[in-house]
Regions:
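Short, flexible loop/turn elements at secondary-structure junctions
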Residues: 3, 11, 15-18, 52-55, ...
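Extended alpha-helical coiled-coil/bundle linker/stalk regions that scaffold oligomerization
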Residues: 5-18, 191-200, 306
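Active-site-adjacent bridging/hinge elements
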Residues: 30-38, 99-111, 195-202, 250-255, ...
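Pre-Walker A-like glycine/lysine-rich segment at the N-terminus of P-loop NTPase domains
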Residues: 31, 37-55
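P-loop NTPase nucleotide-binding core
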Residues: 46-47, 53-198, 208-213
Length: 306
């Protein structure tokens, strides 16, 4: 096979795969990962709202956050300096599309079940559902759970078994609304004492409900909760990946929405990054053909750009 044939074959195979970041096996996702600086800034603890339209890499970077290898790969590739060591981040997948990244834990609550629980409620009531979601997923995360007293661990393990049920999660919080905050306070003290950061991640929120008005209510409640937790705790954050249209609608739902601007990161691609992204998989397929400088994908310096 000639060099030309090798290149054509590599180009034809670029698009092969599942085509959706949530379904691609982790090894494949990391192999094709080409992060940009705005994606790496997602790792800053106080960036609690991540905005990006379709195709900007929200789900890809969301999944990278959940992996030790993924976090280190993103920071190493972009060169963005972080205040917090990514190795000391305890990432907890709080909500995503249907199945969890860990196939051994319960699925996320279904949209119909969520709608049934929050219908006719206000933003304050939806916060309780999201509190239940966070605490249930905490109960399914061994390393985060180990930071808590034994009595809290036992309660959360039981709650974790009901993580797929929106009704049970909401009822658990409604039974004693002070209990989840007391547990989070204890988690914050333990994490701070060990130099750790516990981060609850949320993605695919457009699939949390089937009706647009319910989505606005749910996202508004989640953003309100995330803002309050960032004020109350030193080492606990909610990190929410959101489409611009959902952000706009949800911002109307609670009075402090304007204060989220300082906690916001928008995923942005420069034109040069798009060109590099186009050639990156081609280069990966042709390692035996292209050797040397073409395999080095460092971003140009300011001087080189000129």
């Amino acid at each position: 096979m000639t060099e030309r044939d090798e290149l054509l074959s590599a180009i034809e195979s670029i698009g092969v795969g599942e085509g959706a970041a949530e379904r691609i096996p982790l090894d494949e996702l990391l192999r094709g990962l080409y992060p940009v600086p705005s994606q790496a800034r997602v790792f800053h603890l106080d960036k609690i709202l991540i905005i990006g339209g379709r195709g900007t890499g929200k789900t890809q970077i969301f999944r990278a956050l959940l992996s030790d290898r993924g976090r280190e790969a993103v920071v190493r590739a972009t060169g963005v300096k972080l205040i917090h060591d990514v190795r000391k981040m305890v990432m907890i997948e709080a909500f995503s599309a249907g199945s969890a990244a860990n196939a051994q834990v319960p699925l996320h609550p279904a949209a119909d079940a969520i709608e049934d629980v929050v219908q006719d409620d206000d933003v304050g009531a939806t916060r309780r559902l999201w509190l239940g979601v966070c605490l249930a997923r905490l109960g399914l995360h061994p390393s985060a759970l180990a930071l808590l007293p034994a009595s809290d661990q036992a309660a959360l393990v039981q709650l974790g078994n009901a993580a797929a049920s929106a009704r049970e999660l909401r009822a658990w919080v409604d039974a004693d609304v002070e209990r989840p905050f007391a547990i989070l306070d204890a988690l914050d003290r333990a994490a701070t004492g060990r130099g750790l950061a516990c981060i609850f991640t949320f993605d695919a929120l457009d699939r949390a409900a089937n009706r647009w008005d319910t989505l606005g209510l749910l996202v508004g409640g989640l953003l309100s909760l995330a803002l309050d937790i960032s004020r109350r705790h030193r080492s606990i954050r909610l990190k929410i990946f959101l489409r611009p249209d959902l952000e706009s609608d949800a911002a109307k739902g609670f009075p402090d929405a304007s204060k989220l601007r300082g906690y916001r990161e928008e995923l942005h691609w420069e034109r040069g990054d798009l060109y590099r992204l186009a050639f990156y998989p081609l280069c990966s397929k042709c390692r035996e053909v292209w050797q040397g400088p073409l395999l080095k994908w460092d971003r140009p310096t300011t001087k080189e750009k000129k």
